[in-house]
Curated annotation (Swiss-Prot):
Name of the protein this chain belongs to: UDP-N-acetylenolpyruvoylglucosamine reductase
InterPro entries found in the cross-reference section: FAD-bd_PCMH, FAD-bd_PCMH-like_sf, FAD-bd_PCMH_sub1, FAD-bd_PCMH_sub2, MurB, MurB_C, MurB_C_sf, Oxid_FAD_bind_N
Function: Cell wall formation.
The UniProt record lists the keyword Cell division: yes
Species: Shewanella oneidensis (strain ATCC 700550 / JCM 31522 / CIP 106686 / LMG 19005 / NCIMB 14063 / MR-1)
Catalytic activity entry: UDP-N-acetyl-alpha-D-muramate + NADP(+) = UDP-N-acetyl-3-O-(1-carboxyvinyl)-alpha-D-glucosamine + NADPH + H(+)
Pfam families xref list: FAD_binding_4, MurB_C
Boundaries of every FAD-binding PCMH-type domain copy: 15-185
Name of encoding gene: murB
Amino acid sequence: MSFPYSLKSFNTFGVTQSCLSLIEVRSKAELQAICLPLYQSKQPMLVLGGGSNIVFTDDFNGTVVRVLSKGISVTEDVSYFYLEIEAGENWHELVEFTLNNHMAGLENLALIPGTVGAAPIQNIGAYGVELCDICHWVEYLDLDSGLLLRLSVDECEFSYRESIFKGRLRDKAVITAVGLRLPKTWQPRLAYGPLQSFAADTVTPRDIFERVCEVRSEKLPDPHILGNAGSFFKNPIISAAAYVELAQRFPNIVGYAQANGDVKLAAGWLIEHAGLKGFVLGNAGVHAKQALVLVNLGNATGQDICRLALHVIARVHDVFGVMLEAEPRIMGLNGETSLHV
């Protein structure tokens, strides 16, 4: 079977795979016209944003739809700015847009790769802020009804790296636009690592933005130079009792208390202290500066990356008794699959 359309430039790992058909859409009407017939005929279909959260392990036996819709509109009332953003907008460029227009609240989320439409799917987050903190609503194309529907932030069922779009609406919805609500009374979020040195009464949104960009640029490789998907593993969440037990064995373990009493561990710390920082397996490796990032060292296949990920998961479990979970979607011949080799 021939797969004539290369996906190499459409995934940030730079994996060389192809697909049967590749279509770009720039409006909601185009999206409906393309996606609904494919869905109704049960043909394999993948809706792709920036390709920064995906690992292709095989050629894709179906149609890849790239969402390139653009547009940002802003309204306001006494307390909030309200933004409506089309799904194809670049996330980091949106962060820059808000700061340049004197709207704060997204600065902690600077330099997260990908598009706005992908952001709600895994409830993106960094440095103490998650999308759910500033999301107002999400609009999506319901593939069963063919209608454009809107969910409130509560209806999105957000949790850590999860949403209704990874649950009940998986493969049944295509996000078309996102609504954000940014408070005019700004409260800096400074609880995480490199932001703790700022003073809450003097720090500005631009200060936080620049620090986040600086830290991410130092630790995260440029995917144009070294293929990667950013953080490959979720930070595991364990019970307080399990954390106390681990802390007795590993006094320097990094953990963050959660509102429900659980503790979120730093997956990068676990990987590094399992001896895997800089580890290489075939053409894939654990990044030497940030152990949470897996990289394509040249000509890695999706299988190479999955093999390395499984090795990391097994090693961390052997050392700490903690099971890591991959963040990116794993795409096989006919659609999404599990992490395997």
